Amino acid sequence: MLEYMDYVLRQFEECTSWNKDNSYENIVGTSRNILQFDIPTALKVQVSNRATPYSYNTLELTNNKTINGSLTYLYTNCENLDQFIEGSSSVHLQQMTQSFRYIEPYYHHYKNNSKLEVPKVPELPISLAYGRMFYPSSSLEAMYIRRFPNYYQFILKCSSSKSGSSILTMYLQKNTGINCQELIFSTNEALLGYRFVHNFVSAGSKSNLSLYNNSSLSIGSEIWCALLNLSPGCSTTLRYCSHATNTGKPLIFTLSLNPLYGHVSSTYSIKTHENLTFCTKYDFNIYSIQSNLTLGMELWKNSSSIPVERPSEPVETIEDWPQLSHDKTPMYYHLLTRTENSGASSQRLLKDLNLTFQSSLQKINKERNVIENFNERYSEANFTQVFKVSTSLRDMNLRLLWEGKIRGFLISAGAELTQPPEISTNGLDSLEHQNWSLISPSKFGIQLQYSA
């Protein structure tokens, strides 16, 4: 479950047209949300409210053997952000839950299609300031975001504890839609990094059976270097997103490679229904020849109210056209001879050509409507609860999480069942000596949120 300040930050990105999915940090966000979801570790209560249209605050209490708390304050000069923020009683559950992420393809020619909207870039710099104080430890967290025109964004994060250790991290990002670049520097061991994601812009090909191309292919990479000890790090990830043309079900495939450690990881996620998602992840290490298979799913449940069915949009056919002209048929109008005697033959030729391609045009509209209707049914559904489960065959663990809305409160409860490591007589760990009957809960917690 997203915390209230994380929800405000996500809406701030949406209000300023910043695509968070177009970054290397979230290139495998879907599989991470389904397989490696966060589980509460204690009893946590959060109360949040919107003091003014530009300021938000949160009070949090946590009971884990001792009572701890935190106070959070956020301020921004972003106009109309309060219209994107909703309270816990009216917000959709899918907006507060880290779940399947729809990756919209990047279209280069915005002007050629009136239905595509150009991303709105803020004309003036927009800023956001965030601060959080923990007690009784007296630790501090701070973040400052500056959104500039021309697709630039600067982020400054700082954390300080009573022991004296402080970490400062700076991000300089440029997100143009077709690619995203990030330059990162952290005072922790003088860490310097560079990350980028590039989206391939492609048009429909003759070998593609689907006339409506709604798929996207992205490749990203990151390079790190700790300047104090000269420790390098790098990784590369490939992501492919598409939809089933007959059902509109979205699917995401990723392939990651870390050449320094010899780690290869692949994930496959598919939303088989509006309320059901499956995800698998396979890890393999080239050097140690070790592998692991992780499985996960999430199941949504909506209210008992019957959704209202939307009427399908009518498809324009040849019979609906009273007379063919250049405005109606710009594709074949240049083939006609502009003579007075050839008017009837020209009309017959245009009609024959459009009848030939009418089935293809109707197929494009049908595929597009199926995909758009599937996404709209999920985003507008009134879900009341979601159940997540994931397991790892090598780690022999079981992760459970339930999140829901009850009387205006957002509740999250979860547990992780693991097995303590068992050592054989020769001192080596072996999977065949492990027993699922010995698993016990290693993590359990409940989180309660309310916001007005």
From Swiss-Prot:
Its main location: mitochondrion. It is a multi-pass membrane protein. One of its GO terms (cellular component) is ERMES complex. It holds the Pfam family MDM10. Keywords: Membrane, Mitochondrion, Mitochondrion outer membrane, Transmembrane, Transmembrane beta strand. The keyword Nucleotide-binding does not apply. InterPro entries: Mdm10. It is found in: Mitochondrion outer membrane. GO terms for biological process: establishment of mitochondrion localization; mitochondrial genome maintenance; mitochondrial outer membrane translocase complex assembly; mitochondrion-endoplasmic reticulum membrane tethering; phospholipid transport; protein insertion into mitochondrial outer membrane. Transmembrane segments: none annotated. Component of the ER-mitochondria encounter structure (ERMES) or MDM complex, composed of MMM1, MDM10, MDM12 and MDM34. Associates with the mitochondrial outer membrane sorting assembly machinery SAM(core) complex. Belongs to the MDM10 family. Component of the ERMES/MDM complex, which serves as a molecular tether to connect the endoplasmic reticulum and mitochondria. Components of this complex are involved in the control of mitochondrial shape and protein biogenesis and may function in phospholipid exchange. MDM10 is involved in the late assembly steps of the general translocase of the mitochondrial outer membrane (TOM complex). Functions in the TOM40-specific route of the assembly of outer membrane beta-barrel proteins, including the association of TOM40 with the receptor TOM22 and small TOM proteins. Lacks alpha-helical transmembrane segments, suggesting that it resides in the membrane via beta-sheet conformations similar to those predicted for other outer membrane proteins and porin. This is Mitochondrial distribution and morphology protein 10. It comes from Kluyveromyces lactis (strain ATCC 8585 / CBS 2359 / DSM 70799 / NBRC 1267 / NRRL Y-1140 / WM37) (Yeast).
